[in-house]
Regions:
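FIC/Doc superfamily catalytic core
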Residues: 1-286
Length: 286
């Protein structure tokens, strides 16, 4: 739930060297999501059943894993698989051998020169940090999200300027790289992003909802806030696992959430955009 607000993009002058189309000004709409902390949520019977089934499957996976002799090896494999799949959703595709070479180069202090592999390794490091930091009963905080993002972008071209920092300018999805005039989605303006993140973390630390439902809502809210210059999708999917850990749904394993989403990318992205709803709160669509 949320509302849309009109904004004006001033555009750039002829001295910018941009084409007329890219330097144009326009009116555009930003989406401002409602705060989540303290909100009440209701689910229809079908959704409630799906949530229950998903939680049962995750708990079964956790129980089966705990009976194995080497749970740490499986946990590392699942975390790595989840990180690679989450990266794939963003178009970052790296084969196993290529990733191993980049990992070995990083371990020896060398610059492997493989930009894509470095981004995937950054995602593995970010996920590892997030799930080592957030344990059952521990809070999810803005500093944890920022450090997760810093580790994600570490070793990339954007790391120094943007890693671990809330964006200070307007961003958008789709359209031109120079203005939001034809954007598919424009998240909230930068001056309210930090407050929205504080509220989101407060929601993540509630215990009134089933963990799977809470994680799904938190993920959608994070993506609608789009708090970073880059890496929002990967940190947002890591947040799903943070909620699972914090609520005690998982302790050792990382369920293959991104692996499933990666096989239904268009449906997943359409579903996320559908959560940016600004209609009547009592309607069926809401």
């Amino acid at each position: 739930m949320g509302r849309r607000a009109q904004r004006i993009w001033e555009g750039a002058g002829p001295a910018s060297g941009l084409s007329r189309r890219n330097r144009q000004g326009c009116r555009y709409e930003v989406y401002i999501p409602d705060y989540l902390h303290g909100q009440e949520f209701t689910f229809d019977s079908s959704t409630a059943a799906d949530v229950s089934d998903a939680e049962r499957a995750i708990r079964d996976l956790e129980v089966k894993t705990s009976t194995l002799e080497d749970t740490e090896a499986l946990a590392r494999l699942l975390l790595r698989t989840e990180s690679v799949a989450s990266s794939k959703i963003e178009g970052l595709v790296v084969g196993a051998r290529r990733l191993l070479r980049a990992d070995a180069a990083r371990a020896s202090g060398e610059d492997g020169g493989d930009v894509t592999a470095a981004e995937v390794l950054g995602n593995i490091e970010a996920m590892t940090y997030a799930l080592q930091t957030v344990q059952a009963g521990s809070p999810i905080t803005v500093p944890v999200l920022l450090e997760t993002h810093r580790r994600l972008l570490g070793g990339t071209a954007l790391g120094d300027d943007h890693g671990g920092r809330i964006r200070d300018r307007q961003n958008w999805i789709g359209g031109s790289s120079y203005n939001p005039c034809a954007a598919v989605f424009v998240p909230p303006p930068p001056d309210i992003v930090e407050d929205l993140l504080v509220d989101l973390c407060a929601f993540c630390n509630e215990d009134s909802l089933p963990p799977v439902a809470q994680a799904a809502i938190a993920h959608a809210q994070f993506e609608n806030i789009h708090p970073f210059a880059d890496g929002n999708g990967r940190v947002g999917r890591a947040l799903i696992h943070m909620v699972f850990r914090s609520r005690g749904l998982t302790q050792h394993v990382s369920p293959p959430v991104s692996l499933v989403l990666a096989t239904h990318v268009q449906d997943y992205l359409a579903g996320l955009r559908g959560t940016a709803y600004d209609g009547p709160p009592g309607s069926k669509k809401a």
